[in-house]
Amino acid sequence: APFNWIQPTSKNDSVKISDGWYACGYDVYMAHEIAKKMGKKLKVVKVDWDGLLPALTSGKIDAIIAGMSATSERKQAIDFTDNYYTSNIVIVTKKNGKYSEASKLEDFSGAKITGQLSTIHYDLIDQIPEVKKETALEDFSSMVSALNAGKIDGYISEKPSAMAVVSTNPNLKYIEFEDNKGFEFSQEEIAISIGIKKGSSIKDEINEALATISEETRNQIMDKAVKNQLAINN
């Protein structure tokens, strides 16, 4: 997904992590901007998705910049900054499949749909009438593989990740819904924010840094991430 990935080279303004690998993507670019404005040196630590909250609360990392939304459940365990990206929610499906012309949630009635483990995306599946909710999957590559193999009919994603997937999988497409025809959620639930330890003093510092990065600049950084991911995958 354009939010973050690892690669074996230092191209595209990536940051070295460990074992000769480099982290890249929107999260990394934004982390670099924030660290620069805070006068800090950026260090990126690779942590599995389910290990992010424990890594933060144990002090292994200072902040989670990993495409994470500030859900009410997560807020019970950690604090969040202001958002650093807001996106629409879409469904990725096969371009020539049964649901390729869908335009509203009801059109996915009876479809086998999944989402990423421990995300708002997976919870939103319940809003589709008579849906066949499949087991949550670990990451986007797993969901794409399941979709291509016919194990699922679609998966829920934020738009930038869907754009990146479709650009490298021409047999897939994403369905973007018009107002009142798609998922119901609060902007707070889908806004991507930075997770920090409860009571951490860096919250205000990060928010001050974020306030200086305009919406236009954030969109330019996302465009750069999508473009660079496409270049890596090709």
Where do the protein language model's features map onto the residues?
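A ligand-binding cleft/hinge motif common to bilobed small-molecule-binding domains
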Residues: 51, 67-77, 124-127, 141, ...
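Short helix-initiation/N-cap motifs at beta->coil->alpha
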Residues: 26, 43-54, 100, 135-149, ...
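Ligand-binding clefts/hinges and TM-proximal coupling segments of bilobed small-molecule sensing domains
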Residues: 120-137, 174-178, 207-234
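Alpha-to-beta junction loops
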Residues: 39-41, 58-66, 111-112, 148-161, ...
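Flexible hinge/capping segments at coil-to-helix
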Residues: 12-13, 94-112
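Ligand-binding cleft/hinge of the Venus flytrap
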Residues: 4-18, 31-40, 120-140, 144, ...
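Extracytoplasmic small-molecule ligand-binding "clamshell" domains
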Residues: 1-68, 76
